[in-house]
Amino acid sequence: MCLGRCVPGAVRDLVARNPIITLTTDFGTNDHFIGTMKGVILSIEPDAQIIDICHSVQAFDVLDGALTISQAYSYFPTGTIHMVVVDPGVGTARRPLIVSSDRHHFVAPDNGVLSLIYQREQRLSARHVTGEHYFLQPVSNTFHARDIFSPVAAYLAKGVDPEKFGEAVTDFVRFSAPKPKAANENTLRGVVLKVDRFGNLITNITPQDAPMLFGENPGTFKIVVGQREIREIKEAYALGAPGEVFGIMGSMGYLEVAANRGSAAQLLGVGKGTDVNIVLGEAAAGQ
């Protein structure tokens, strides 16, 4: 990872010509928050294209926010500005950041919500935003998304150099997403990271963690979630019988436990944080 003056000026140039700002929050859509943020952005940069990635991140759940932005950001054009506000520490001493990679800018609180970006991007520059003249005044301690993050994103869209906002930092908050671990010689233990809108259980298990599940001849295995033992991997949701629970490789790159036209979470009575055990060989066949 490169920190400091390492991001080419081409990103700044493309932002100025074609400003796209994405929004990822846990604010929901029942209140005025999102509309107000868009109003602030457009008042500063009327040419901004504002794209909603997601406003249904689980409330206060920084890991869910990190997963959400990590799945979406790379599909946007070079120069896109991603505002990510999942901010249970709003109004405290936690820092507002601008993080720049070779292709994108991120505006977010320094609470780890960009942790998966830090893992994936090799060249990054992070800055603590201290230039209060870029803020909407007076700053509310309960709505930094309106008063700090939105105007900062808008000024970036206008082409203001990230260096103008504050000093470079290297001690930003980051965490590692939970990784599967060997429970014993025959069992790999993962966890449900999130439950999507359809009730699919998205685990933290990748094909690299469990190649035996996704090869042409997977051998004997079972996936244990709650009280249910699952012994099939399907290639598409519709290949399961209605209500059948099975494993599938999801578009996020993780093993999912899913049900055809049903909610695996409801059928199994489990949710985020539930253990997912993959048992192999004779240990799987013996029960």
Language-model segments: residues:
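Structural motif
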Residues: 19-22, 48-51, 80-83, 96-98, ...
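A conserved acidic, glycine/proline-rich C-terminal tail/linker
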Residues: 204-269
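Surface-exposed interaction regions enriched in Ser/Thr/Asp/Glu
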Residues: 274-281
